[in-house]
C-alpha cells in the first residue's frame, strides 16, 4: 500500500449520461409546471377552460415523447455518440403478431458455410467417381500402369513355367531315349 493510503476511488462505474431526449423532456416538464403556477396565480376561478387546453398539450407532448421512445430507445452513451458503422446491425424487436413462422428460416453464417462445404464435397466425390477430376485422372493412369505391369509379370511367369515344363519334358525324353537304347 503506498504512503497516504489509496489514491483514487471508483473509476468509471458510477458515471451516468443522460440522453438528450430525457433532458428535453425534463425541460418541457419544468416549463409546463412554471406556466401552470403562473396561470393559477393570475386567475383562480376563471381559468377553468385553460387547464383543459394544458391537458391536451400535455397529452400531445407525452405522445410525442412516447413516439420518440418507441422509435429509438438508446441506453447509456449511444444517444450522445452517432454511430456510423456500416457493419453494425440494429436488432429490432418484433411482436408476436409480426413474426413470420411460415417463411424460410435464415441460417447463421457458420451453418450456411457448413452446408456449402458439404455440398461442395459431395459434388467433388461425384466428379471423382466419374473420373472427371485431375486427381481421379491421375489415379486411373496410375492404375493402368500397375495393370500393365501385372500383366507383363503374369506373362513372364507363364513363359518361365512353359520353359520349365519344356525343359523337364525334353529332359524326360532324353532319359527315355537313353533307356530305349
From Swiss-Prot:
Q: Where is this region: Disordered?
A: 1-118, 151-181
Q: Which residues carry this modification: N6-methyllysine?
A: 126
Query: Site of the Glycyl lysine isopeptide (Lys-Gly) (interchain with G-Cter in SUMO2) crosslink?
Result: 52
Pfam families xref list: PP28
Q: Does the keyword Acetylation apply?
A: yes
Give the free-text PTM comment from the record.
Phosphorylated by several kinases in vitro. In vivo, can be phosphorylated by CK2.
Residues recorded with modification Phosphoserine: 19, 57, 60, 63, 176, 178
Which residues does this entry mark as bearing N6-acetyllysine?
132, 164
Q: Where is the composition biased (Basic residues)?
A: 1-14
Residues modified as Phosphothreonine: 18
Keywords associated with the record: Acetylation, Isopeptide bond, Methylation, Phosphoprotein, Ubl conjugation
Superkingdom of origin organism: Eukaryota
Phosphotyrosine PTM positions: 70
Instruction: Enumerate the InterPro entries for this protein.
Output: Casein_kinase_sb_PP28, HAP28
Bias (Basic and acidic residues) occurs at 50-59, 102-118, 151-167
Q: Give a GO cellular-component term.
A: cytosol
**The protein's name:** 28 kDa heat- and acid-stable phosphoprotein
Q: Which organism is it from?
A: Mus musculus (Mouse)
- Gene name of the encoded protein: Pdap1
